[in-house]
């Protein structure tokens, strides 16, 4: 669950457009930018965990792309505080937090994590 006062709850394990973790991400980002007009968003660091291991990896790239697009659209009104003066120009740096996937199911790992590699949009 999500509330403006406390952010995403501890049991919020799902990410995606308009999910509790997304609302927390956009809410905290906007709060940080509003706190000081001199604050600038230089990048978003996305750490891919293992929760998606049991999901539908073929849908991951499209769902992640939709999340990034929504984030950038939701920050459009704060473009002046984004690197390069555009929310669309804020890079997403993607990493992973576990090698469990790679050891247990290389193809699932490559489907999900591999979709981040060499993306420039």
Language-model features: locations:
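Cell-envelope and extracellular/periplasmic
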Residues: 1-121
């Amino acid at each position: 669950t999500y509330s403006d006062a406390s952010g995403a709850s501890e049991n919020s394990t799902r990410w995606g457009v308009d999910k509790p973790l997304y609302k927390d991400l956009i809410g905290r980002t906007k709060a940080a930018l509003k706190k000081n007009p001199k604050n600038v968003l230089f990048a978003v660091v996305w750490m891919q965990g293992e929760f998606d291991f049991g999901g539908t990896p073929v849908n991951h790239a499209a769902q992640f792309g939709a999340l990034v697009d929504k984030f950038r659209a939701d920050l459009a009104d704060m473009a002046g505080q984004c690197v390069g003066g555009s929310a669309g120009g804020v890079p997403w740096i993607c990493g992973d937090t576990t090698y469990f996937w790679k050891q247990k199911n290389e193809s699932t790992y490559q489907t999900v994590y591999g979709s981040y590699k060499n993306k420039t949009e």
